[in-house]
Amino acid sequence: RGFDVSLSTLGFAIFASELSGFASPFAGRIVDRLTHRNSMVLGLVGSAVGCTIAAVSPSPIFFAVGVTVLALTKQSFDLGLGAWIADHVPYNQRGKIVGLTETAWALGLLVGVSVMGLITAATNWRIGFAFAVLCLIVSMFVVFNRVTNETRVLHESHSTTPQRVTGNSWLVVFTMFCIMCSAQNLFVTFGAWLEDEFHFGAARLAVAGFSLGLVELVASVSSSRQTDKWGKERSIALGSLLVIPGGIFLCLGSKSLIIGLIGVFIYFLGFEFSVVSLLPLATSLVPNSPGTGLGWVLGAGTLGRAVMAIVATHLFESFGVKGPALMGALFGLLGALTITNYRRVNAKS
């Protein structure tokens, strides 16, 4: 709210940035042709450029340009990392490794976002973005020096198999759409709810962000330990279903900080567990082209976030946090039903 604009206006800015994610399927094909190191470094460089634009932006429009560049180029890192895992880790162990990488992501949220919040409270949000640029530059050097630049490993031949998402695999893509729809409902309204209902400032919001980082850390560690044992599809369904009681808790306890936060924590625990469990499945959708399958899944997730960035902010302004909470719970149920149907159809084939 540093630009003194309404939440719905900011929602449109987020929507514009999320549109860049529609390039994920195309980006996935490119990543499958690049070395893992090049795709990851490219993503980090672009993310630093996007954060820089956002930090110096004089208006919401330029801010939207910055976060759009960030969202667009970050895909290269995400897809490159996913392709590296797919090329080096057997499928029956992939849930563990993806869970570990997502644990690192949760630690980044736990520490990085919290530090950015404290920096913002002490200075302003532009300095917070500058700190993010510094972290990205350090990450570039780490990846460049530690990841080899060898060409991609091609596994067994699939010359007769279409190198695209086909058939029942689209159910996995739609599941990611539903999961990200459910998550975005609270991602874009959680902070505003705390500000409006309980008068949270930047420092207290940073503490709340730190707490969410702990929740995501628990979910990622749990996924790395359980997803391969329970099965990817079952784990996705369980996580999606957990969103439902979280949304209901928040809806019923929106005027109580304790009850509301319990609902939020349950909500994000389910979301994070489901999405981490889905990523290893996404890398196997297209034989020999993990980036392509992952790209379609991430693109569907982007579509979900883009749509809900507008819908959720308008629901919040009309009904308070109850509207987004119930909408998110509905999409959690839809995601669980979709992945269960995928599992049932695959079991028959």
In which residue ranges do the predicted regions lie?
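Short amphipathic helix-loop junctions that connect adjacent transmembrane helices
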Residues: 1-7, 188-203
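Central cavity-lining transmembrane alpha-helices of secondary-active solute carriers
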Residues: 15-27, 210-219
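Conserved MFS/SLC helix-loop-helix module at the cytosolic interface between two early adjacent transmembrane helices
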Residues: 23-55
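Helix-to-loop junctions at the C-terminal end of transmembrane segments
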Residues: 24-35, 219-231, 316
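Cytoplasmic helix-loop-helix junction between adjacent transmembrane helices
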Residues: 68-103
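Helix-loop-helix hairpin linking two adjacent transmembrane segments in secondary transporters
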Residues: 101-144
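C-terminal transmembrane helical hairpin of 12-TM major facilitator-type secondary transporters
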Residues: 233-278
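A late C-terminal transmembrane helix in Major Facilitator Superfamily
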Residues: 290-317
